[in-house]
Swiss-Prot record:
GO terms for molecular function: carbohydrate derivative binding; glucose-6-phosphate isomerase activity; monosaccharide binding. HAMAP family: G6P_isomerase (MF_00473). This is Glucose-6-phosphate isomerase. It is an enzyme of class 5 (isomerase). SUPFAM superfamilies: SIS domain. Keywords: Cytoplasm, Gluconeogenesis, Glycolysis, Isomerase. It comes from Acinetobacter baumannii (strain SDF). Pfam families: PGI. Pathway: Carbohydrate biosynthesis; gluconeogenesis; Carbohydrate degradation; glycolysis; D-glyceraldehyde 3-phosphate and glycerone phosphate from D-glucose: step 2/4. The lineage of its organism: Bacteria, Pseudomonadati, Pseudomonadota, Gammaproteobacteria, Moraxellales.
Amino acid sequence: MSKSIEKFPKELVSPIAQLHSLVEKNSKLHIKELFAAEQDRFQNYSVKFDQLVFDYSKHRITKSVLEQLFALAKTKQLTHWIERLFSQDKVNCTEQRAAMHWALRLPSEYSKFPELTKQVHTQLQRMYVLVEKIHAGQYRGATGEVIQDVVNIGVGGSDLGPQMVTHALCDFKVKTAKPLNVHFVSTMDGSQLSDLLHQLRPETTLFIISSKSFGTIDTLSNAQTVRQWLEKALGKHDRVVKSHFIGVSTKAEKMTEWGIAPENQLLLWDWVGGRYSLWSCIGFPIALTIGIDGFQQLLAGAHAVDEHFQNTNFEQNIPVLMALLGIWNNNFLNIQTHAVLPYDGRLKYFAAYLQQLEMESNGKSVQRDGQKVELDTCPIVWGEVGPNAQHAFYQLLHQGTQAVSCDFIAPIQRYNADHFTYVENAEALIEQHHLALSNCLAQSRLLAFGNEALDSAELKNLPIYKQYEGNQPSSTLLLKELNPYSLGMLIALYEHKVFVQSVIWNINPFDQWGVEKGKQIADQLLPILNGAQNDLSALDASTRGLIKILLGKVDG
């Protein structure tokens, strides 16, 4: 391909063809050679913005590769699509909806969309009123006791985002009139509820039913179970449901029908996708944990990235760079799996959150025009807290046969702020933080440079099974500190990365039709498992055989 391309002027050859040519030309190129050839490579391939640093120097890229990636973005009209996203255009083409999660973090004084801003802040203010009442011990259950446990019942975006943020910001938990604990329940099999309910008192427990449609069977089955638990203990009175449930949904009428009091109904909108909804009242558990000021800082961090994304040239635009690096790795270097490796235990749920954000958004095979995609779309996204992952799957990263790209994430500072309750252990804890940071840097270095990172004397007689190929690309994201503002920034970076990649692949990142049909088929099978129907003739042999075992008609 490269020879034929050289016959034509560069401007007449598509960026995709140019990138394929660069792959062929640099097929043997190793990351260590890129660093050897460019002494100031870190300065040339890193970006500092606000409270974070993005280092992408350990990718298998050159200036020529970046130029063609930027050209590709321009041919796909990325600037136009960014403008469309930050308008009220219906960029969700299959559902004919806008995608305005960015509006959820607009400052109250924002003048460009006054009605939209007012709509959002009206609901946020209603949420803040409930948060203040609960924190002050003024919100009471049906028997008059103060609420001390809040259980969020949701699934997908109504669970993953709030749980991830609540856990990540545990250091910023606010003091309340009485100790307040926040819990999360999502699984439809009831196992989480079974484990949790025996630890709680009905009199002092409040449940949040968090469901955009207020029709998700996973969530409503759990909600019905806890309703029965409450009514068994406190009696079947309207005030039990009205005092012990808060609903968050687009469907006010369904919440009312279920029995939730109007003052306990918090609304969101169809233009908010579930996996983009933690900034809305779906984030109620977050606000309960870190307080109103903390929640507003989370929104402010995300809004700062929204502004950066809209107003920064591609060369310094972190979400654009993250996205284009992913395109290069996935579509040109054939690296089809991506590991997210935070070196901070508080980010325990971050990889799981990104799995939904990235794979549910961009796990598509049909373009916006209905044609099959021309390039592979979303890679497999996975990961774990880095220090734990070192003892689990880093063997594969270092010496396996799979090419894997990685994101390393770490805070620069920890254990040095006044609000930490464990400040008396600060010195030992700071040493532990430095231990985590040293491992983060060591692993990214070894993945990139391989044997080059080893001592030459050690390498001289090292058996091959102890050697390292390296050349595994990675980015490193350093946060000044993991706090509400910086976490808001981090999440928004990945949201916009996803959008940029969807533009390059020409797919809709705001629908999820792939998950719908499975739910419908489950509805068809449920009557058979419940004994209300026994005709299995329409089913495949495997499903028939499994159902017979489940019903005890044959031995398993």
